[in-house]
Design a protein with these regions (language model features):
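Transmembrane beta-strands of outer-membrane beta-barrel pores
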Residues: 1, 38-44, 53-54, 83, ...
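Signature of Gram-negative outer-membrane beta-barrel scaffolds
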Residues: 1-29
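Residues on the lipid-exposed face of transmembrane beta-strands in outer-membrane beta-barrel proteins
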Residues: 22-26, 77-83, 131-137, 151, ...
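Repeated loop/turn-to-beta-strand initiation elements of outer-membrane beta-barrel proteins
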Residues: 26, 31-34, 87-91, 141-145, ...
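Surface-exposed extracellular loop regions of Gram-negative outer-membrane beta-barrel proteins
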Residues: 30-76, 97-115, 230-245
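Outer membrane beta-barrel strand-and-loop segments of large Gram-negative receptors
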Residues: 64-66, 70, 90-148, 158-162, ...
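C-terminal beta-signal and adjacent terminal beta-strands/loops
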Residues: 217-282
């Protein structure tokens, strides 16, 4: 590690930002609520992003922060719909659009001696349109369904560096819980994910899943759970490819997927029961 010699470095930065926000909501009945919000936000670069130290993890790459990074400023408009139905059906859906100026991104380029340099920069303007949904439903006395999902499109524009990139991203995470007699519970979870990539980069999706069994003893005081995470896969493969004018790089990570666990918990004493009422307009 070494720090470039530069006596003119100035690490002081003073800024003022106007951050307005507004919201409105409508409750047509006791099952539906609509929220419309507008907000602004500031995201400042982290110490790691600003750190000018140069790191040489190997003979082909260099990693360095950028002390000249500016904070990114975002505007967001979102419409949220909350629905409460029979059998404890709960649905929350949001549609949003955001615009971000001076968006901070990690990127890479080919430097001297054909070394790939990884750093951070303010990459023009980012546009994002997305839909997210959260569902929870007691379909029967013995069955509970839940799911989280999102899908969106992300666009990066920076004319000075010739960047005009559009990418889709998505996620879907369902779960099933079976409530069986004699205080047995069985369940399964899954997940499919693809994140929005860095500039000039394409990401591959990843998936994971798990199963569990739970049994309560001693009037619910003792709980025993057995969990199996991705039992049929040894690794989760994560891959991304960056294409530059002079070089193309592919990074592949193999994350340990398969694992098993046993959890024991015991509750001492019994507290007083309290009736809790939920304000469904929140």
């Amino acid at each position: 590690l070494h720090l470039p010699h530069n006596s003119t470095n100035d690490f002081n930065n003073h800024n003022s930002y106007l951050m307005p926000s507004a919201s409105a909501y409508w409750i047509p009945n006791n099952k539906n609520t609509l929220y419309l919000t507008y907000s602004t936000s500031i995201t400042r670069p982290t110490v790691q992003m600003l750190n000018p130290f140069i790191s040489n993890p190997n003979s082909n790459t260099i990693r360095q922060g950028n002390p000249n990074l500016k904070a990114q400023y975002s505007h967001e408009v979102a419409l949220n719909w909350f629905f409460n139905g029979p059998h404890n059906l709960s649905l929350n859906t949001s549609i949003s659009y955001s615009n971000t100026n001076k968006i901070i991104h990690n990127y890479s380029y080919l430097g001297e001696n054909n070394k790939v340099i990884y750093t951070y920069g303010n990459m023009g303007v980012g546009h994002n349109i997305g839909v997210t949904t959260n569902l929870r439903w007691n379909a029967a006395e013995w069955l509970m369904l839940s799911a989280n999902g999102s899908i969106g499109i992300n666009k990066l524009e920076a004319a000075d560096i010739g960047l005009n990139q559009t990418d889709w991203y998505y996620s879907f995470a369902p779960s099933l819980d079976f409530l069986l007699p004699k205080q047995f519970r069985l369940g399964m979870n899954g997940g499919l994910y693809k994140n929005a990539p860095a500039p000039w980069t394409e990401n591959k999706h990843i998936y994971m899943y798990s199963f569990y069994a739970n049994k309560s003893f001693l009037k619910g005081r003792l709980n025993v759970s057995i969990t199996a995470n991705s039992p049929f896969n040894k690794y989760i493969k994560s891959s991304s490819t960056t294409t530059l004018p002079d070089i193309m790089t592919t990074q592949t990570n193999y994350i340990t997927a398969r694992s098993f666990g046993i959890n024991l918990s015991y509750s001492f004493g019994s507290g007083q029961k309290v009736n809790v009422q939920r304000d469904r307009t929140l």
